[in-house]
Amino acid sequence: DRSVSRGLGDVYKRQTHNIVEKQIYSYDEAYEESLRYFQGDELAARVWVNKYAVKDSFGNIYEKSPEDMHWRIANEVARIESKYPNGLTAKELYDLLDHFKYIVPQGSPMTGIGNDYQVASLSNCFVIGVDGAADSYGAIIKIDEEQVQLMKRRGGVGHDLSHIRPKGSPVKNSALTSTGLVPFMERYSNSTREVAQDGRRGALMLSVSIKHPDSEAFIDAKMTEGKVTGANVSVKLDDAFMQAAVEGKPYVQQYPIDAANPAFTKEIDASTLWKKIVHNAWKSAEPGVLFWDTIIRESVPDCYADLGYKTVSTNPCGEIPLCPYDSCRLLAINLYSYVVNPFKPDAYFDFDLFKKHVALAQRIMDDIIDLELEKIERIMKKIDEDPENEEVKRAERVLWEKIYKKSGQGRRTGVGITAEGDMLAALGLRYGTEEATEFSEKVHKTVALGAYRSSVEMAKERGAFEIYNNEREQNNPFIKRLAEADPELYAEMKKYGRRNIACLTIAPTGTTSLMTQTTSGIEPVFLPVYKRRRKVNPNDTNVHVDFVDETGDAFEEYIVFHHKFVTWMEANGYDPARRYTQEEIDELVAKSPYYKATSNDVDWLMKVKMQGRIQKWVDHSISVTINLPNDVDEDLVNRLYVEAWKSGCKGCTVYRDGSRSGVLISTKSEKKEELPPCKPPTVVEVRPKVLEADVVRFQNNKEKWVAFVGLLDGHPYEIFTGLQDDDEGILLPKSVTCGRIIKNVDEDGTKRYDFQFENKRGYKTTIEGLSEKFNKEYWNYAKLISGVLRYRMPIEQVIKLVGSLQLNSESINTWKNGVERALKKYIQDGTEAKGKKCPNCGNETLVYQEGCLICTTCGASRCG
């Protein structure tokens, strides 16, 4: 009886409300209870307590385990459901959420629904922009302010830079010519890094059209060490550019990019710029590529472009292309949970239950829009009550008014999935094969039809989104696909409309998948088996010492199995508690459906084709990373990107292995040649006349500085630092990242150090007398640091030495921090940061990785 069920829900609501309002738990209490909830999974428990348990501004914790959180969410969604016909009860909703089994609100909805301790949005992501002409300084600063205002409310932000004039364009101010895109990329990046979000940095996506004359500078911007570190960058590629790049033809850039009669045009060699995109992606994983014509052609909201729904950029992870001032909330359906008898010969996918839950997921997402509108009303009320004068508050207030209008008018949702990799394995299908891809396509077609059918049903009960117009949409390729697959659904939609302008996405589900204990999004398993290390006391009983570091600390290596790999083992009679040899582990993996189906060894071209086939049933986009081994060449990246474009993908990102090797240790056995015993590093006291050198730029207070790091056999041997400006400092093109430091002796015996570099055409330029550029105080400290580098003190110890210098001058201390950052990039990946504790989990398990500190226990990272 639904009335009885609703009554139970109300009882739970009162109980949970009292817990949330009155009971305060210590971190240890919440962690221990969550550890029991996740059946001993320390990482899942820690992530939940740190990121998702309700806390007030003093750090008091009001939820003991995810059970409390799920009741909090269920009660709030049930409150909205009670406003509409056939409302779901809190108990019915709780059963969908419990243990992250079926439906999982992601990120901001999980944290914010029913949370009265923070005034924040429920939206995961936003896109902002300016209507009309937007190339003025005022427009650029306006975007900067809006970006910060959204990030302080937990939102990730995306915006496009194609409206900014190219470098050298005439402007009617004291500068006379435009500075171009790159300085503003740095500005927006710095703003992102300033905004703390519960200890996180802000998330930012910057995009630009390949048609923009400054797009090459945009593509290169992050290749300079320390530049634009607070943003992801993606380049919007149109079909004309891709065709020209593939065929080796010229391509015309212009500004404004959409003008029929542009003020500026430039013909370029498309294949040369394409090679640069490929090279940079191969080297640094950026820029990502967005196939913009495909995005616009397939976009249902762009059928209403003239009403304010013209897509201009994407959210930071790329799965939601958005128009200015629209936002989206995310939810994932756990695909693994619909496999009956997983990993058994009679395993099958329960499509009947799945279809029912897809409809409910879309319904819950629509309820969350109502909850979001309430949250925005609360944000605007707080702005009104803040003591600042109206002029100061106006920009933030107007921003939220625009978002409120777009959210209510279009009612956009982001229903997605997670655990695709585990679902396929549980059915005995190998990720990346044709058979697996066909099944995935069937699943995502079911999601699309189910979500749109649910949206049409809600239109009958609750009303369609207010600007729905069938005639506008009738030629949209996605809508035509739905109509062909389900004519009855399309007929109903024409008659009643639908509740939501767009419904679907596939987002990365990083922390979500930790709590579902599955693979992430549509990705394959990263590793089915990996190793971690923990420090042990060798005198304790039952301790197995596998590794002793140079300080004498003992460590035990232990095998960690992917959760669903354990399920496969148990289903096939293998004991997960046994201590296996490396050979036995290799044999186990080879017998499992995860064999040759990990992120590093899946068939990459097939993965791209799979993404394209699934994309046909996702109205927004898909966030996917193609993980590649370190030794692949640039040609493979080229082939993957071209295949992604041809297959109908809306975007693509590649990531070459190496950036997180300090977190997970592959258990693959590799025979290595016997190395001779270690010997002390060779000290070269007589400096060679010429040393290769890296150029590292950094900020010292408000001044721009540059460091020249001389290298001997790849190891830092000396460091020179100085101002970088046009007058008395060092004038050096931004494109210069390496060169040579040459030691010269003048006729009077005076030593001099010169820096020499080559430009793109091979011509050499020499900057004489580096030491003459220095303040003597900096020069003396640089000599000290160079001395310890020359005698091969370990880099991490040099950094510790520099950090311990007690200096009175604030500018010297800022310079010191810049030197530390410059040297960190030379620390060997995996080097332990001794004596440092992870600020996230408190363990002394930090290692250096590409100049950043990464925790091998919880995965937290900190750079700079």
Language-model-derived ranges and their functions:
Residues L93-Y94, Q254-I257, H357-Y404, G408, ...:
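Internal maturation/activation junctions in enzymes
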Residues D10-G87, N173-R187, Q197-Y309, V340-K344, ...:
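Conserved, charged catalytic cores of large soluble enzymes
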Residues L237, E298, C303-A305, N315, ...:
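Terminal amphipathic helices with adjacent charged low-complexity linkers/tails
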Residues Y490-E492, S666-L711:
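Short, Gly/Pro- and small/polar-rich lid/capping loops
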Residues D1-Y12:
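Single conserved hydrophobic/aromatic residue that forms the stacking wall/gate
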Residues E42, G318-I320, E372-L373, E377, ...:
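Catalytic alpha/beta core of large soluble enzyme barrels
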Residues E76-S82, L96-N173, L181-F184, V195-D198, ...:
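Function-dense linear segments that define catalytic or interfacial modules
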Residues P839-N843, T857:
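Short, cysteine/histidine-rich loop/knuckle motifs that typically chelate Zn2+
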